[in-house]
Amino acid sequence: TPLKRSLRRALRRQKMSALLLIAPLLIFILITFIAPIADMLFRSVENEIVQDTLPRTTAILETWDSESGNVPDTPVFKALYQDIFIAQERKLHTRLGSRLNYELTGASSLFRKSGRGVGDIGEVYQDQFEDMNAFWKKGENWNDILGSDAWLAEIKSWKKASGQAQPPFEIRAQIAEILPQTAAFYQIFADFTQNEKNSNLYKKDPWELIYSAFYDDLTGANAARIDTYTGPGAAELSEAKAAAANFETVDYKAAFGDIDKDWLKMPIWDTIRAYSPRFTNGYFLNAVDMQKSENGPELRPENQRIYATLFLRTLFMSTVITLSCILLGYPVGWILANLPARTANLLMILVLLPFW
């Protein structure tokens, strides 16, 4: 009936008015209370740093049989070299080391030391290419080969003083096909140089990592396709391909062993493998003196169990303080309730005085 419809509309308006009145308070509570708690709870299980910093290493580690008792093979160490090299350029390897140090004592110093040592690994190939032909020393020559014609035209006319953004690097299509690893890592190098360092890519000499990838392409499955390339630097590419067959190679596993013997031991690899997923219960396990392992959660060694002891001590002191307050508070409260008002007020002042 019209009366009922009118009543429903009136009630609806009344509810909306009440909701609007409390809306600012609800929003305030959501922003200042609920959201921080939700963020804290998310951070307690979030663990993206391992996979984001070591993407190639963690991908290959998925197929590693940790129960064999042997550290991973050379392909994993090669991926580790590539990941740590990029991470140390971006100053991320120390953050990862600090994160893993919560789980394995010594991981922080291990990653710092490795960040300083990976440059020497790539220099093995860099020195050989540059000794063979000085052409490979200059960043301009690398860009002439790897960059597209359109990008080269733009970057050569670009001036930093112009205030305009640097034209983003574009790989030459044919090079991406015949030198896939070099192209992939050079793209990372280009993004870092242009966006994070804000430097002129055309004049920047490549990372040592680029030379390692370049060697892999020259001696890999696509090596025969290099002879079909006719663009800039074709003669130098053919020369490099012929020379690379006789280059000194890098044993990545031995190289990391030279940096630190801990890379040839199981604990660091078990830790990386256990904490490679993007979400983890590791923080909660640590809080109760447990740790992740290949066999699931397990107690930490006895000399590392500190949180349970701290919790029991805290619980004991809380109980003692609570009982003391009850034993002191109830008699004082009873006395104050039964004394004359003047005397009770004086005693109340004496009770409150220590708090002031």
Locations of regions flagged by a protein language model:
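Transmembrane-helix boundary motif in ABC transporter permease subunits
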Residues: P2-S6, A10-L11, D39-M40, V320-L352
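Extended assembly-interface/linker segments at domain junctions
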Residues: L19-L20, P36-A38
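Faces of alpha-helical transmembrane segments in polytopic inner-membrane proteins
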Residues: P24-F28, T32-A35, C325-L328, L350-W356
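Membrane-topology segments of multi-pass transport proteins
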Residues: T1-M16, D39, R43-A308
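Loop-to-transmembrane-helix entry motif
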Residues: Q14, T314-S318, T322, W356
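N-terminal signal-anchor/signal peptide hydrophobic helix marking the start
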Residues: K15-L26
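Residue-level marker of structural boundaries
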Residues: N47-V50, A341, F355
